[in-house]
Amino acid sequence: MKVRGRLLLAFAAATAAPIAAQEPVVAVPDPEALFVSADPALHANKQLALHFMRELLQCNHWERAPEWLSERYLQHNPNGRSGRDGIMAFFTRTRPRTDNCATLTSPVVAVLADGDLVTVVMPREYDHPARAGEKYTSTWFYLWRVVDGKLDEHWAPATIAAP
């Protein structure tokens, strides 16, 4: 009986799915469809996040930032400075401008709005640390607080990159 039990256990272990297996994180086909709500206040907040993602991050139209960002724009990302002027200067200096901003091309998994908070969840691809040449996906998010009709505070799971 002991031998049979060991054989069954060995078979189960050999045929079980790897512990580190995962389902890939996949974006929706039409990300802009997620930035809507039947609730007018939540819809307005989601639209602010859409403008940030599309006009500012994707197309680098930072001259329009005052339409959507508060002057104080608090940054809880260790790689960014607080203040609208600082973020405008950084992105204007470091990224090229794209003229066609008709649709959001960034992959998005979900957009959640609750009260004054809006979260955009995105897939992110990483190099697998144990298997050279392989990639895996996980999630990334942006979270904003809306104050007086503008994005006022921002969080992201960013870490400080090594020099």
PLM features: residue spans?
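Short beta-strand edge/turn micro-motifs at domain boundaries
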Residues: 23, 139-163
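A short hydrophobic beta-strand element
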Residues: 114-124
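N-terminal signal peptide c-region/cleavage motif recognized by signal peptidases
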Residues: 16-18
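A solvent-exposed, acidic/Ser-Thr-rich amphipathic alpha-helical stretch
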Residues: 62-114
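Short, low-complexity N-terminal intrinsically disordered segments enriched in polar/charged residues
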Residues: 21-63, 67
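Short, surface-exposed coil-to-beta transition loops
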Residues: 104-106, 135-141
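Short, cysteine-centered beta-strand-loop-beta hairpins and adjacent loop/turn segments enriched
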Residues: 96-101, 126-136
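Bacterial N-terminal signal peptides that target proteins for export
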Residues: 1-8
